[in-house]
Structure formats: C-alpha cells, structure tokens
Amino acid sequence: KVILPRYKCIPQKFQEKMEYRGSFYMDLCSDGKQYYVGIMEYQKDGVVYDFIDNDEFFSWGNPYTNLIDDIPKFCYFAKASLAALNYLDWTPDIVHCHDWQAALVPLYLRTCFQNTNVGRASAVLTIHNLRFQGIYDRKMIQYWSGLPDYVFNKDCMIGCQHVKGRYRLL
C-alpha cells in the first residue's frame, strides 16, 4: 500500500480511475481545528495507491511549488496518512516515510497514534535529496503538528535537529 497526496496535477486519466474509499474529519493544529480527509484509491499491477484528498492543501500546484510554507501541508499529510490507515482498518508492519515531508510520521506514531493499531507499526525514514531538509520555526511546527511541548526536547525529537531556534526535520 502506498499513500500519497492527491495533487490536482495528477493526470486526469488516473484521477478518473480513482475510487472513493471514505472520508472523515481529524484535528490537526494545536487549537484543535478539524480538517477533512478524503481517501481515493487507485490500483495498478497489484499495488494499492491511497490518495489523501483535501483541496485546502493539495488543489494547487505540484509537490515542488511553494516550498516556503509547506509545513501546514505536510503536517496534515503525515497525520492524515496514519488516520487513514486506522479508518481503513489496515495495520502495516512498517511505515516507510520518504524525505522531510513525511518525517513527522514516526513522531505521530509514538504520540497521537500510540494507542491505536497503526501505532504498533515500526517506521523507517529514507532520504532522496538532502538539499530539502524541512527547516522550520518551532512555533510553526508545534502549531500545525499539534504535538505536545515534551516532544520538542533533544531526547524526544528523534532525527529532528535543533538549529538556531529552528528545527530540521531530517
């Protein structure tokens, strides 16, 4: 199973073959704001691709536009991906996270999802391009991720380095 954002730049011929699997709302920010999570499925060559659908985050551009303020989009995607697995009642043995955009997944697994089926999964993080490291201000990460204060200490932010008041997610 592969989980991806449903960007509008995905060619129409693939969009037309996606099937609706369900939707729900989840809290995201530290203020508890609720966001829509839609799940669209596409299958090819025996592989199931689940696309996380939310026009607020994925309706414009492509994965490489607007890199400056991507933290809201990828906090949403990381948490929505795990919430979708719970919604679909599918528990992986290992969650493979790729690049900084998914680097919060292991933290979410051990905090927000620790008492769920998906919270039992292990996680591995791979890196494709070290140029993009997801460096953001702590307040911005904390607001959008909704992660508690204790996560932002050097012993808990596994893999996330503190650099001059900002955090590097890789």
Regions found by a protein language model. Name each.
Residues K1-L170:
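Catalytic cores of nucleotide-sugar-dependent glycosyltransferases that transfer UDP/GDP/TDP-activated
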